[in-house]
Amino acid sequence: MKRRSDALLGSFQATNVTPPSDNSNSTAGGANGSNSGTPTSTSGKKRNKLIKSCGFCRRRKLRCDQQKPMCSTCISRNLTTCQYAEEFNKNIEKKATYGPYPNADLLKKVEELENKIRILEAEKNTNSSASSMYTSPNFPPLGTSVGRGSTETSSPLPDGVINPYADRYYLQSKHSGRSTLYGPTSMRTQIANSNWGFIEKYKQLWAKVKVERNKWKQNNQKTMCRELGLLDESDWQPDPLIKQICRFLPSYNKALSILDDFFNDGACNEINVILDKAKVRRDFLDYFMPEKEVKAEGDRSIVYILSNPKKNYYKAAVILLILCLKYFHTDVPTPIEKFFTLLKGASTAKVFYIERAQMLILFYYHRETYSFGGDGSDLVNINECLVTTVTTIGLHLNIRETFKEHEVFMGSIESLENVWLMAIFIDYNISCNVGRPLLINKFYLDENQDHCILNSKSKTYEGKLKRYLKLTRPMLLTLYDRDKFPDLKAYSKRIINFVEEELGPLGHYTGENISEEVPLRESRILSMAVGLLLSFYALIHSVLKVRNIESKNNTFQLVLINFSIIVNTTIRCYRIDKALYPEKFEASNPHLPPHMALSMSLTAGLFSKTLVFFCSLIYFKLTLFENGLCLSNDMEVGWSDLTKLTVPLDKDLSLGTAMSLYSSIFDRLFTVGNKELIRTMHRSSQFVIELAIERTYRTILGNVIEFRKLTEETWLAQIKQELDPQSDNPSSEAKIVSDRQRDLSLAVPTPTPSIIPMLPSPGETKNHAKSQSEIIQMLTDEFWANYNSGWEELINQSEFSTLFDDYKDN
């Protein structure tokens, strides 16, 4: 009994594990002082050389390009497998890792067992799932983990599959019959294909939160079905739609002043470049008719909106959208909504004006700023209409040559080039957020052509945006090409290099006091880069099964950087508006100040993508008990540095550190300006929903942390009592557990998982294997029993309305 207790306790004790370094050839017990064992040989150190080529190329002495999961040699020979040797873990002695068995046999056995577990987990999840979701059939959901000593092992690909990402999808099917398809770069697809259990808990909790959300939306008259709701509204107005619109417009001089401000406002400089100021002003004077009688204050009302003989109302639509951005904000009058809906849906060939493209871009920008849906799916139709319009007009041609004689009625060449650039930018955003192939393909945009708009060496914001799109568009095109294998790890390195070379020190964006030297608009490019990088990390994690310490560290690092960018951009925009427009913060103003509204657009889509992946990944780790995983070994917050996109190989970003930073970063929103920032942001329905989702996720994580720690500490107390019944009083041990549990809060981090290899003597191997299996199963059963019971209590007793009014002073 004493020996068994020693073995059990050993499985829960921490070891000093340091991430493997590519720059070191030392074995465990060397310079790092590892406790994993002592050398078994008295001879000199033996160099452990990593074999980088695959087995096929090595046996036939062929040159291997080392691509994973399959090298080009194996692909060209139509081989079904391409195996690489496992990377040697330099911190654990080889004998302790592999034992007396040959490495190749052990790897083969591990692969067989992992495949069996995946099949069983897939069957289990299929039988137990009642939700209406459909995921990629060729790639079963992830149901297990890979041990800490592993590096990267790819699941066997189906015969003939070269690109394992192209057909990775998630079909969301509502009970109403509405369906939405998401592709590989969408976080919905990533989580649905992973089956980590987090989403099921989220659905249960969100069902409760949604009741309060709907009440809040009803009280504040917020809806995402504005366009469809227009069909239900009665219209007893005898006047035509144009005259109805005029009743809501500002005075003639006021409207003209708003147009001038739009082109002079720094918060709108990013979008006004698609317009020719002189042409827009001329269109206003030509088509917006004021009344003849001048009022006492010297101004006149707008009484009618004209069009040209060909009914080009898109000129008026551009001006009305400027008024929506600068005057109406979220409160767009119903007649104007109807006007936009009619113009967007027109199917005749008589609508292909440059003003139609400009209207669609402005409409996209307005919706992204004031009513973004979280994942961009509500903008898909706008993007498709826009791409059709710009390519039908011919903006993909050499603009300076094709339209040099058309500036009088189409606007300046520079504005036309910017319309084309914004169409490329919007197409990229939809592709990344929703997971759809680019609509602007290589036929329309070939970087090898001299007139390609993305060929720029300018150091301006526009130049950097063009170079970023030139870098990443080919990556997305390859991602959806079934005949090519996208090297996502190489793509990730190129994106990281771009950020470091083009956007300046990362600390300027992640520090609490964001540098004023950084142009605000460059936060958009950075948000795009880290968003795509996160999608690649997620695919590498789930498809290629890369689970080493370096991958874990860099994933957590990227997530925390993303959170910092979002929060710091919001705070910076708040401070700019506070200095320039203090009157915008008065309680009587129902709209966001201009720069704070801009912040919603600068980071649109990044928040939901980062949050759902981070919380799902942590939930997965917290609910895993295999391989002696014990979270209670490391309670301290360790190393952290958010000034680089990658973590040094000699550092470890623990789970506890990640949780602590995550909480502290978001909690900053509630302290700036004595809660003035959070009160102001509650004018945005998008922000309110995102904040409620974040609090819901944090509630789930806090709940699972609570019961995970309770389970581990209870078992540790029992093991210690069994080892030495006289040393500890069971009641005092239980009291310690209870006290620690009571002090737990959602902001307190959970420790980094540690996997402790067990090395019993040969005579004990069988009994030890049985005892460790039993203890893991007992821990698992006790955790889930307590967790499910506590979860039901949380669901039934929690007050969720506070998620929507927590900005108020207590």
From Swiss-Prot:
Signal peptide: none
Any matching Pfam family: Zn_clus
DNA-binding region: 54-82
Keywords annotated in UniProt: Activator, Cytoplasm, DNA-binding, Metal-binding, Nucleus, Transcription, Transcription regulation, Zinc
GO molecular function, one term: DNA-binding transcription factor activity, RNA polymerase II-specific
Location of the region described as Disordered in the Swiss-Prot/TrEMBL record: 1-47, 722-742
Gene3D superfamilies assigned: Zn(2)-C6 fungal-type DNA-binding domain
UniProt keyword Lipid biosynthesis, yes or no: no
Recorded GO CC terms: cytoplasm; nucleus
Compositional bias annotation for Low complexity: 23-43
One record GO biological process: regulation of transcription by RNA polymerase II
Positions with biased composition (Polar residues): 12-22
Highest taxon in the source lineage: Eukaryota
Coiled-coil residues: none
Primary location class: cytoplasm
Protein's cellular compartments: Cytoplasm; Nucleus
Membrane-traversing stretches: none
Function: Transcription factor involved in the regulation of multidrug resistance genes. Acts in concert with YRR1.
Name under which the protein is recorded: Zinc finger transcription factor YRR1
Originating organism: Saccharomyces cerevisiae (strain ATCC 204508 / S288c) (Baker's yeast)
Classification of source organism: Eukaryota, Fungi, Dikarya, Ascomycota, Saccharomycotina
